[in-house]
Amino acid sequence: MKTIRIIGAGLSGCEAAYYLLKKGYFVELYEIKTIKKNPIQHYDYFCELAYSDSFRSTDLNTSVGTLKKELELLDSLIIKAAKYASINQNNELVVNRIEFSKYITNYLKTFNNLKIIEQEYLNIDLNIPTIIAIGPISTPSFLTNLKKIINKKNLKLFDTVEPTILKQSINKNICYSLDNNLDYLYCDLNKEQFEKFYNALISAKTFNSPLKNEIKLLEKNNYFSIESLAKNKQEFINHFKPINNNAYITITLKKDSVIDNLYTIVNFQTSLMWNEQLKVFSLIPGLENLKIMRYGVMHKNNYINTKKLLNLGVQLKTNKNIFFAGQIIGVDGYVESVCSGLISAINLDRYLNNKKMILPNKNSTIGSLYNYLLKTDSNFNPMRINWALVDLIDGFELSDNSKKFYSKRAIELIKQYLKKINYK
């Protein structure tokens, strides 16, 4: 019986373990939390959640709802657990966190081919097939050892994300480009518009992190949010110098390096609550009908340069025994972490059986996420699933009425993927 190691019993690690245990591998699952908990951990069960509502919508018209459906078709343990522990009946999947974690822990423990090792995993053995599925608050000792095999330049420790918006929600009659260079668009604010925007920004509510002093930690490392910058009004004004002589300030939008349908609001990394981001940033002229596809966040995180380090099987290019899963590869969100664990396990199994490693089609939600991660540039920020990551269907621009067609296509593509990998 072939031995596989999985480092981390979070969402991605447990999803990977479940798949490989079913395949008959002997799985060594390393988890340190029973002997050393990080600041946001409280229980000894696997897959401890910080929030009960982070599985988000079950509506198939949403990208995350479709992603959960794709995972369900792939027999996801985590989705089974979430449904078991669900505490509501509407379109939001809210779970009892303790019951959710208990379900997964107890289910995995029924496998005789699982060995749970409750200790810190320090020395990465390159000769043993391994999935590294660590979370955003990993131990310094493990990160030190990880840097030895990937080079410390390829590991980021903080997440400072600017809001990413849908191109079609930008008013091109107000926002403009220079010399027809559509890589950048510009939004001018006169003094009256600026004052309204500025006052809304400084009075907006910020996210309350479960990690104590997280914002201070970020600022200590020279990562400042747009709301922190706004504490000094004149400095804020100087930061957004006008391009047009008639403007008081100018805000820049930058096209995404992979997806033409997305733009980021430059220098707007933020800890504002999501509803506040929509309210405040829609005050920018040209963004009145703003659709945010990925909200800005700022928090402690560990993630690697996926495009540079990993191949299409999420396998380390320099050592074929090492695979990665979870937030470490640059996915953002609970459900996204689940799918990364499953894909890593599928491809590790295929690698060990001398089969070609494959990903789902890029127009499935799972495939679109990997297509983005494996193509984006080295300065990317973690991405969560959204419909802008898939190719547009001819005649169907992204809208509330057209999303059902995108969902139907994605689910059909996952069914084709199941046949391709002979999933049982």
From Swiss-Prot:
One MF term in the entry's GO annotations: tRNA (uracil(54)-C5)-methyltransferase activity, 5,10-methylenetetrahydrofolate-dependent
Its EC number(s): 2.1.1.74
Chain residues that bind FAD: G8, A9, G10, L11, S12, G13
Record-linked SUPFAM superfamilies: FAD/NAD(P)-binding domain
Domain of life, per lineage: Bacteria
Keyword field: Cytoplasm, FAD, Flavoprotein, Methyltransferase, NAD, NADP, Transferase, tRNA processing
Main location: cytoplasm
Cofactor(s) the protein needs: FAD
Subcellular location(s) of the protein: Cytoplasm
GO cellular component entries: cytosol
Catalytic activity: uridine(54) in tRNA + (6R)-5,10-methylene-5,6,7,8-tetrahydrofolate + NADH + H(+) = 5-methyluridine(54) in tRNA + (6S)-5,6,7,8-tetrahydrofolate + NAD(+); uridine(54) in tRNA + (6R)-5,10-methylene-5,6,7,8-tetrahydrofolate + NADPH + H(+) = 5-methyluridine(54) in tRNA + (6S)-5,6,7,8-tetrahydrofolate + NADP(+)
A Pfam short name: GIDA
Alphabetized InterPro entries for the sequence: FAD/NAD-bd_sf, MnmG-rel, MnmG_N, TrmFO
Entry's Gene Ontology BP terms: tRNA methylation; tRNA wobble uridine modification
HAMAP family: TrmFO (MF_01037)
Function as written in the Swiss-Prot or TrEMBL entry: Catalyzes the folate-dependent formation of 5-methyl-uridine at position 54 (M-5-U54) in all tRNAs.
Family under the similarity heading: Belongs to the MnmG family. TrmFO subfamily.
Name of protein: Methylenetetrahydrofolate--tRNA-(uracil-5-)-methyltransferase TrmFO 1
Biological source species: Mycoplasma mycoides subsp. mycoides SC (strain CCUG 32753 / NCTC 10114 / PG1)
Classification lineage: Bacteria, Bacillati, Mycoplasmatota, Mollicutes, Mycoplasmataceae
Gene that encodes it: trmFO1
